[in-house]
């Protein structure tokens, strides 16, 4: 009553509540301005990918730990950050951390993903945040300069050289079984066949013929990894077909600038991972040039135990058995068209870029149902153990019942009187 009366008198004398009540009487909530900044920001640079992640990833006020964040299939770790920083940063090359590259009609697309996989802190067994996966893509136009800087007169970016000077764009893609479209899922079952299509987009360039010089399968995008398997070797010999597989080049070609081949999928027995990468070295020659030992596409046919080329004389494949293919002392005359092409290539080499060849990686190819998939094993092993236990118990019960019946019959035969089963057990 006294407080209300005092406020009423103050209002009459001073004419305002704000002069009478400098302190807020009723409790109020504090409102913070909403921010438009996304929790994950991506900068697609010329040769680098920069990912910036807010520690308040879920917008709940609970900060995540940088150690719970990784990038890509190879689980790349973020840069070291201070505890006072409110963001976590990744800076990686476009081809690092297992990123995947795809060639579309209008762009090169590099794709990867950000993983938040929380772990309990200290000795706790609880989590306060969820696992999250954020897909990331960088699109680079194929018909423009992707450099973020101005082009210097003394330096031509690789993409500019490839698209505007030589007009060559190489690609290696996984295809569906009918070769009609690109395979949407990279998953396989062991025993499946992978359909791969190598191609060069020539633009306004002279007609060219594409070859797969060599291919190698590895567990990571690094083609020089210690654990590897050669698929194509010796300048175009599909050596994987020598083993227990049907791997082969497809003949005839759909076009000179396209080469298709199949590979029986496999996994490395000495490693538990269920993914592989295939890296192929592609090259081109003028379309009118006759294939030779250095430029060929040869498959091994088991029914005849011989090598056969997609085009050209069968003699060019004989070196595949020797494991050494080359043309020592080659001195044949070049055609006028080839001399002009070589001159253009020489000019490109002087600018530090050789665009008649390229090394392309496709992957990862993921194998489902592999024996090392512990999640599958964990779900089936208990069931199998229970079934075995029940089966064993059944066998033991039947055996005991048989023994009891035999003993009862012998006892009846010896004593003649009819004895009820209850007396037998006594």
Curated annotation (Swiss-Prot):
CC annotations in GO: collagen-containing extracellular matrix; egg coat; extracellular matrix; extracellular space; plasma membrane
Disulfide bonds: 44-138, 76-97, 215-280, 237-298
Entry annotated with the keyword Transcription regulation: no
Coiled-coil residues: none
Keyword Glycoprotein: yes
Record topological domains on the Cytoplasmic side: 407-426
Glycosylation sites: 123, 145, 154, 160-161, 244
Source domain of life: Eukaryota
Modified residues (Pyrrolidone carboxylic acid): 23
Tissues of expression: Expressed in oocytes.
Extracellular side: 23-385
Localization annotation: Cell membrane
SMART domains xrefs: ZP
Job description of the protein: Component of the zona pellucida, an extracellular matrix surrounding oocytes which mediates sperm binding, induction of the acrosome reaction and prevents post-fertilization polyspermy. The zona pellucida is composed of 3 to 4 glycoproteins, ZP1, ZP2, ZP3, and ZP4. ZP3 is essential for sperm binding and zona matrix formation.
Self-association state and partner proteins as the record states: Polymers of ZP2 and ZP3 organized into long filaments cross-linked by ZP1 homodimers. Interacts with ZP1 and ZP2.
Entry note about domains: The ZP domain is involved in the polymerization of the ZP proteins to form the zona pellucida.
Entry similarity comment: Belongs to the ZP domain family. ZPC subfamily.
Name the UniProt record assigns to this protein: Zona pellucida sperm-binding protein 3
Species this chain originates from: Canis lupus familiaris
